[in-house]
């Protein structure tokens, strides 16, 4: 049977987004560990490089693991124009839209605090979090998207990226050690703002990778996703799905090149969320979305999507569950005996495969029961 393309209506959910979100989250639910363990079986330069890409660089630099967080935020951005169109079609007022944005942002911040151990009552606790940054960056971007037209939104993204670069380059931390580089952990104004204003513990004592000032360029990441979603919503009469995918792919190349060139003066750094990092991960995110969108929504090849869709529809659930549910213990109960009988090199592969399978089956159970955590 020939695959059927399904161009989305103005407010329809994109299946490619659920699949891409699931692919992204797959790496934090055990797949990255599995890749590393498989690479250890086949020693060599290529395997070593692949394994290294499954972890974050110490400071400057870029790896695949650096793409997971910003891709999720970018996808949240793509979704918003579709959600906004649906809300407006149901008669939502401007006040309703503001309340929904604030509610979602606040819930994500709350989930971030819970993830960090809110209920342990161990004070002071770390208040910055991945979910908290998503909540703040997405909510601020949504407010801007709601109140400005496309050209102004693009201008805001440019102003954020150039302004952030200028600030970090020209304003070092007042308490920086003598000779400290303005882009170092000790010398950057980003860490100083965290030490001055961010309540609770900092992740690295003097710096937090999900701190306050570095959330500002993350707003640009979310906004770029929203601009992409707005572009995809253009009617088929104005622009075909094939052309949309092509233009998004070309934009991916352009952003990647800009990021690589910008790295010469403003290093690519996830922890600082530098403007060059924003551009490079925008390139990656646009490229991955173009691929998934073209295959799934334009060409209609959907038979392979379910494993990723199961994850993508409950992405916040699995993120929180990794912290709350003892998947490692459950996996050891079912797969520990088999892993123990494997050769030494294969045992970690069996264990990590079991962990990934248990995590996925948990989500599949929720999927079959139609239980989804919606924020």
PLM segments and residue spans:
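Alpha-helical transmembrane segments and their immediate juxtamembrane cytosolic regions
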Residues: 1-375
């Amino acid at each position: 049977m020939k695959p059927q393309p399904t161009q989305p209506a103005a407010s329809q959910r994109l299946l490619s987004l659920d699949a891409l979100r699931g692919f992204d989250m797959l790496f934090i639910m055990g797949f990255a560990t599995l890749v590393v363990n498989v690479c250890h079986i086949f020693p060599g330069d290529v395997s070593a490089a692949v394994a290294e890409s499954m972890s974050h660089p110490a400071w400057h630099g870029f790896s695949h693991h650096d793409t997971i967080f910003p891709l999720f935020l970018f996808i949240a951005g793509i979704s918003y124009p579709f959600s906004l169109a649906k809300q407006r079609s149901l008669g939502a007022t401007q006040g309703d839209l503001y309340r929904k944005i604030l509610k979602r942002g606040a819930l994500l911040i709350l989930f971030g605090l819970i993830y960090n151990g809110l209920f342990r009552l161990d004070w002071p606790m770390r208040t910055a979090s991945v979910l908290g940054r998503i909540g703040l960056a997405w909510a601020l971007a949504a407010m801007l998207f709601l109140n400005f037209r496309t050209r102004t939104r693009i201008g805001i993204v440019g102003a954020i990226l150039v302004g952030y670069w200028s600030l970090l380059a020209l304003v070092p931390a007042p308490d920086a050690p003598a000779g400290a580089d303005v882009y170092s952990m000790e010398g950057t104004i980003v860490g100083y703002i965290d030490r001055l204003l961010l309540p609770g513990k900092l992740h690295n004592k003097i710096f937090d990778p999900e701190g306050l000032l570095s959330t500002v360029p993350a707003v640009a990441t979310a906004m770029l996703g929203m601009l992409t979603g707005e572009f995809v919503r253009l009617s088929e009469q104005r622009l075909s799905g094939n052309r949309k995918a092509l233009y998004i792919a070309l934009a991916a190349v352009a952003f990647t090149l800009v990021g690589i060139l910008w790295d010469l003066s403003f290093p690519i750094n996830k922890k600082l969320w530098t403007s060059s990092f924003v551009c490079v991960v925008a390139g990656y995110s646009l490229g991955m979305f173009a691929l998934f969108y073209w295959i799934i929504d334009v060409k209609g090849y959907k038979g392979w999507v379910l494993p990723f869709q199961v994850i993508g529809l409950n992405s916040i659930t699995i993120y929180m569950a990794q912290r709350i549910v003892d998947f490692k213990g459950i996996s050891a109960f079912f797969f520990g005996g088999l892993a123990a009988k494997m050769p030494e090199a294969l045992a970690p592969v069996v264990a990590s495969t079991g962990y990934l399978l248990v995590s996925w089956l948990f989500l599949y159970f929720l999927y079959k029961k139609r239980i989804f955590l919606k924020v």
